[in-house]
Design a protein with these regions (language model features):
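Core catalytic lobe of class I
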Residues: 2-273, 296, 305
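Class I S-adenosyl-L-methionine-dependent methyltransferase module
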Residues: 108-109, 275-305
């Protein structure tokens, strides 16, 4: 396994490296749940690495690279268990794409996973304020002056989505809740097809993960989104994987909720911040392991405290 750095503690494992390579070292049917936000093709530049999927020359190259990871994620997921990804429709720009419009990026990623064998399970729309989007992007379709000019070019804002897929087979470890631990009013909120109450600012501190030499966008998942998915679809001590861990939002939340987390991140500054965040999550000393000292298999079979 080609790992640049790694930190392993009894509740989590973080790897600085290429998720396509590191996923190959994860045993079959060993991951209880995966949740992540995929790179948005060529929309953002996350790092300068030629291994970064976000640096693909075009959509076809990105999708071809992503298929390799999707196949590995199918292999490592336990039968009957779930994988969720967080993304949005992508804007088409006149100067880059030749037209103004939208690309259904979530549907393309979902189809890749279905082609690997996953079953489409559910979809949640996460409301986002269109005024904030307009102020940030100055998108033509959201400008009020366009209403006065020609409103056929106006559109609604772009929400986020959580799309969840299930691996076929019988779940060997059922996820069960009690009325007390998961009351009906909570379930009614989670069962809504639209989550209206997610605060976009509800993320881990990301300032320290920026490189001055990079351009550079970081798009951490909102903590409340991660919490809801983990609460609904996992048991305590389950292993939660994020192959694009960024600053560690998913493993951080998993550990705080009594689960175990695996995070893989290619960019060094993001990885280093993830290490700091996980140290905060466990509130104790972590065991730093030189590359090659402990395998993923060792972590998966360890008896958690």
């Amino acid at each position: 396994m080609n790992v640049l750095e790694q930190v392993i503690e009894n509740r989590y494992a973080l790897y600085n490296g290429d998720s396509c390579e590191i996923a190959k070292a994860i045993p079959d049917n060993s991951i209880h749940y995966t949740i992540f936000s995929p790179p948005f093709a060529s929309l953002y530049t996350y790092s300068n690495s030629d291994r970064d999927m976000g640096n693909s020359k075009g959509d076809d190259e990105f999708y071809n690279h992503f298929i390799f990871l999707a196949k590995e994620l199918y292999r490592v997921t336990m039968p009957g268990r779930l994988l969720s990804f967080h993304c949005m429709d992508l804007p088409l720009m006149k100067e880059r794409d030749g037209v103004i419009g939208l690309k259904d990026f979530p549907a393309i990623i979902r189809q890749i996973f279905e082609d690997c064998g996953f079953i489409y399970h559910s979809k949640v729309t996460i409301w986002k304020n269109p005024v904030t989007e307009m102020q940030r992007t100055k998108a033509l379709g959201l400008l009020h002056k366009q209403i006065r000019k020609d409103s056929t070019m106006n559109r609604q804002g772009i929400p986020d989505y959580i799309i969840t897929l299930r691996k076929p087979g019988e779940n060997p470890e059922r996820v069960s809740h009690t009325h007390e631990s998961f009351p009906v009013n909570v379930w009614q909120n989670y069962a809504s097809p639209v989550w209206m109450d997610i605060r976009q600012s509800d993320t881990l501190q990301k300032k320290l993960a920026r490189d001055d030499k990079d351009e550079r966008h970081i798009c951490p998942l909102q903590l409340e989104v991660i919490q809801r998915c983990i609460e609904l679809w996992t048991n305590p001590n389950d292993i939660v994987l994020d192959p694009f861990a960024g600053i560690g939002s998913v493993p951080y939340t998993a550990v705080k909720m009594g689960r175990r987390g695996i995070g893989v991140e290619l960019k060094e500054s993001y990885y280093n911040q993830a290490v700091n965040n996980l140290e905060i999550a466990v509130k104790g000393d972590v065991m730093e392991c030189p590359v090659g000292q402990m395998s993923i298999e060792d972590f998966l079979t360890a008896n958690p405290a």
